[in-house]
Design a protein with these regions (language model features):
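A general structural motif
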Residues: 1-3, 33, 136-138
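Nucleotide-activated donor-dependent transferases that construct or modify glycoconjugates
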Residues: 1-12
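A structural signal for short, well-ordered beta-strand segments and their strand-loop junctions
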Residues: 5-6, 35-40, 140-142
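A short, glycine/small-residue-rich beta-strand->loop->alpha-helix junction that serves as a flexible
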Residues: 10-20
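Histidine-anchored nucleotide/phosphate-binding helix
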Residues: 18-30
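Short helix-loop boundary/capping segments at the starts of domains
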Residues: 27-34, 57
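Secretory-pathway luminal glycosyltransferase catalytic domains
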Residues: 41-147
């Protein structure tokens, strides 16, 4: 069986990094028709592995676990999209790196959006909060401070 996984998902960066890493893993697997897996939701991770805590993650059903530790680890070769690596990605490996570009998963965008749909218990208070702005213009601003 051709399989790839991301054993360090949740250890390599924070929550935003996890989103890219999960989506890229799925995108690489889909392109090459590989099976794939991610760490189980109850795995303790120092960086607060929390994809299953707030998102439906419907595409990950039956896809939790680890690839064997004897699988080679394939890290990113650059911080930019590596088309050559993407097109020739080997099977039976552990994926690593940040992979912070949608180019790894744009071809399965709808599946990723479905996985990253918020759980009802997250959406309910958000909808309640947003009712106070009904009919008005709302702008959300995210400021990222670097060290």
């Amino acid at each position: 069986m051709k399989m790839i996984g991301y054993n360090r998902l949740g250890d390599n960066g924070r929550f935003g990094n996890q989103l890219f890493q999960y989506a890229s893993l799925r995108g690489i697997a889909a392109k090459h028709k590989y099976d794939w897996c991610v760490p189980p939701p109850d795995t303790y991770k120092a960086a607060n592995y929390g994809l299953f805590d707030c998102f439906k993650m419907s595409g990950a059903e039956g896809k939790v676990g680890y690839v064997p530790h004897n699988f080679e680890t394939v890290d990113e070769t650059t911080f930019a999209f590596d088309k050559e690596q993407f097109d020739s990605f080997p099977d039976n490996v552990n994926v690593d790196g940040y992979r912070q570009t949608e180019k790894y998963f744009k071809h399965i965008e709808n599946k990723i959006r479905k996985d990253f749909a918020f759980l009802p218990e997250i959406m309910k208070p958000c909808r309640k909060f947003m009712k106070q702005f009904a009919g008005g213009r709302v702008v959300f601003l995210h400021v990222r401070r670097e060290r």
